[in-house]
């Protein structure tokens, strides 16, 4: 049986830095494609910062042509204004792939950590160690790019689990 290659874009939304990571999935094999960070200057008005994120992610989608995307969910914290701004960046991160007809999944940060490291409260160093094992050719330039790759890996794992469950249910 020939397995189809699925290209997945993982996005770690942030107003200062939005990480992105692209992987290919062939069966149960993960292949690193690219990763990086879209940055916006704090000195700019919010609308221009959101536009910078939008334009950067449009370039990523256009260049790498993912078939599926995944975005990290955010939680409300003590800084309500900061949470709202992060939510706006997250909205842009979900909108860009959706505008290209790409389905967008969402994953909680603890689920990403549990999927990649095996512990829901893993730290960034543990994530980077596992990324080196799972994607040896990846060298994320920022922690945000590393997180985005972890989000893409989480989506790859959960989509395969869902496919297996559908096959078992059909028996």
Swiss-Prot record:
Reactions mediated catalytically: Endonucleolytic cleavage at a junction such as a reciprocal single-stranded crossover between two homologous DNA duplexes (Holliday junction)
Gene Ontology annotations of biological process type: DNA recombination; DNA repair
Alphabetized Pfam families for the sequence: RuvC
Single GO MF descriptor: magnesium ion binding
Cofactor note: Binds 2 Mg(2+) ion per subunit.
Binding residues annotated for Mg(2+) 2, in chain numbering: 72
Class of the enzyme per the UniProt entry, highest EC level: hydrolase
EC number: 3.1.21.10
Chief site of localization: cytoplasm
Domain of life: Bacteria
Localization per record: Cytoplasm
Active site (record annotation): 12, 72, 144
PROSITE patterns: RUVC
Entry-linked InterPro entries: RNaseH-like_sf, RNaseH_sf, X-over_junc_endoDNase_Mg_BS, X-over_junc_endoDNase_RuvC
Keywords attached to this entry: Cytoplasm, DNA damage, DNA recombination, DNA repair, DNA-binding, Endonuclease, Hydrolase, Magnesium, Metal-binding, Nuclease
Binding site for Mg(2+) 1: 12, 144
Family listed: Belongs to the RuvC family.
Role of this protein: The RuvA-RuvB-RuvC complex processes Holliday junction (HJ) DNA during genetic recombination and DNA repair. Endonuclease that resolves HJ intermediates. Cleaves cruciform DNA by making single-stranded nicks across the HJ at symmetrical positions within the homologous arms, yielding a 5'-phosphate and a 3'-hydroxyl group; requires a central core of homology in the junction. The consensus cleavage sequence is 5'-(A/T)TT(C/G)-3'. Cleavage occurs on the 3'-side of the TT dinucleotide at the point of strand exchange.
Protein name: Crossover junction endodeoxyribonuclease RuvC
Species, as recorded: Afipia carboxidovorans (strain ATCC 49405 / DSM 1227 / KCTC 32145 / OM5)
Gene assigned in the entry: ruvC
């Amino acid at each position: 049986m020939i397995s189809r290659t699925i290209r997945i874009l993982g996005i770690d939304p942030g107003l200062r830095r939005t990480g992105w990571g692209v992987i290919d999935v062939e069966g149960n094999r993960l292949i690193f494609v690219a990763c990086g960070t879209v940055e916006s200057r704090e000195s700019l008005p919010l609308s221009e910062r959101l536009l910078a994120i939008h334009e950067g992610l449009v370039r990523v989608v256009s260049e790498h042509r993912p078939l599926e995307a995944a975005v990290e969910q955010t939680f409300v914290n003590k800084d309500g204004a900061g949470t709202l701004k992060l939510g706006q960046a997250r909205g842009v991160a979900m909108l860009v792939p959706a505008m290209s007809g790409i389905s967008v999944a969402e994953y909680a940060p603890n689920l990403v950590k549990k999927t990649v490291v095996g512990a829901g409260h893993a730290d960034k160093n543990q994530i980077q160690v596992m990324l080196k094992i799972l994607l040896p050719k990846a060298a994320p330039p920022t922690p945000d790019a590393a997180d985005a790759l972890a989000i893409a890996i989480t989506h790859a794992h959960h989509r395969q689990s869902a496919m297996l469950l559908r096959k078992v249910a059909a028996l």
